[in-house]
Amino acid sequence: MKIAKILAAAALCLSVCSAAFAAPAVKTFDVHEGSVKIDVPQIKGAAGGKFADNKINNTLNFYVLKQLYTALPLSMRNDDVMRTAYNKTFKAKDGSEDAREFVEDVAGFVNFKLRCDLEDVKQYGGTSVSSYDLQGQYNVHFKGDNYLSVEQRGYIYTGGAHGMTLFNAATFDLNTGREVELADLFKNGSNYLERINKVVAAKIAEDSRMFFGPVEVKDGDRFYIQDGKNLVIAYPPYEVAPYAAGVVTFAIPLDGLSDILAVDIK
């Protein structure tokens, strides 16, 4: 009888421990307002609890807001001002819920503006285009116990030969909810940029004609973790290559950087 109780207690302990360290769930929050259709990732169950969930979701919502603002005049698109105002407004414990409502409101306004812009072109310039639109999707590249990597892509079309591809990648610490910078992954004083750039240079040498010139990876460049195996440095169209090249990515095996990694990516 005692053995049965011990085994039951052990099983319960294992189930609780597994739940405590399980990767978070990622669900889709749909923003569909007429010609604006964006799928927004929202997480629940980060290791850092609701505080981390809220912080991560707030950041993901902000990046969607940036996509929406591409449809607005340049005078309304100062990233630093936007982020400061956004963080001040939605920094509360449950601010991500209010932020989602705000994103929906902005999407409604953007949809209205796109419709008005198209009608103006039809009236004064003429066009065979049936709609202007803004679409967005996301892809979870890595969801582990400690880190989450998400890519958010969008596409806005407002006439012309082609639209504009929108791209962002972000990696989060699931314990704190903080967005991770490239430097955070490596030991202090390590030559991580030199090592990464060596791999990138070798890949470019295989087909240098598609690039504008040499590519130098810097702190602040976009990146994501792919399946816990690769560090992927990513650049939107026009940043390092022509539009036709799409989003340019360089996959660097983490095994080759294991001696200078400061974190356990799992």
How does the language model describe each region?
Residues 2-22:
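Sec-dependent N-terminal signal peptides of Gram-positive bacterial secreted proteins and lipoproteins
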Residues 20-266:
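Compositionally biased intrinsically disordered regions enriched in Thr/Gly
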